[in-house]
């Protein structure tokens, strides 16, 4: 709020640059090599999510759907073969970034309690939820677009790929 579309675009570009730079940080040089388990990040995460869902169902907390059961069958067979490992934030989003007060420069990324070693694309996927979640004003589509200046998901992913040399 309170910024024009051009400024908003620059803010999103700065956020994407910080997101793209994070996996380049050498965890071993920072003595963080034991900060999380190396490798198999997606396999571990999908197993954990499915265990949590099963526990919620067993306790009556969840009303699991057929779609969730389909997802439970689909996930283990579609884990990406590229198993890069880097520092991931775990909650990388605009609200966890402190910007310079008068320019679109990231000063700090805050709220690190979910950080671990994992696959760099996990933070990218989380950061792109804005393009897929339904807001209070309804689903995002041509009739209800994101605020002016926020790049399309395709443009955001393309710029991330240019910055990192990898794509989703």
What is the role of each PLM region?
Residues 31, 116-118:
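Short catalytic/ligand-binding loop motif for oxyanion handling, primarily in non-cytosolic enzymes
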Residues 86, 105-108, 120:
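Protein kinase-like catalytic core scaffold
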Residues 1-87, 101-103:
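ATP-binding pocket architecture of kinase catalytic cores
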Residues 37, 166-168:
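All-alpha amphipathic helical-bundle segments outside canonical DNA-binding/catalytic cores
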Residues 97-99:
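Hydrophobic residue at the +6 position relative to the catalytic HRD Asp in the kinase catalytic loop
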Residues 110-115:
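Activation of the activation-loop gatekeeper triad in protein kinase-fold domains
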Residues 87-89, 94:
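Catalytic-loop of the protein kinase fold
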């Amino acid at each position: 709020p309170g910024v024009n579309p051009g400024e908003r675009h620059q803010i999103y570009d700065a956020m994407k640059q910080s997101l793209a730079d994070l996996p380049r940080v050498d965890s071993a040089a920072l003595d963080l090599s034991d900060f999380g388990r190396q490798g198999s990040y997606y396999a571990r995460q999908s197993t954990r999510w499915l265990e949590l869902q099963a526990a919620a169902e067993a306790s009556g907390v969840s009303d699991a759907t057929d779609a969730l059961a389909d997802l439970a069958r689909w996930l283990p067979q579609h884990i990406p073969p590229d198993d890069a490992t880097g520092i991931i934030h775990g909650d990388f989003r605009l609200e966890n970034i402190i910007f310079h007060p008068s320019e679109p420069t990231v000063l700090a990324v805050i709220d690190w309690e979910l950080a671990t070693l994992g696959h760099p694309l996990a933070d990218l996927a989380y950061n792109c939820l804005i393009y897929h979640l339904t807001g209070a004003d309804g689903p995002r589509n041509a009739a209800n677009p994101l605020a002016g200046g926020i790049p399309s998901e395709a443009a955001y992913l393309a710029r991330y790929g240019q910055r990192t040399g990898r794509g989703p």
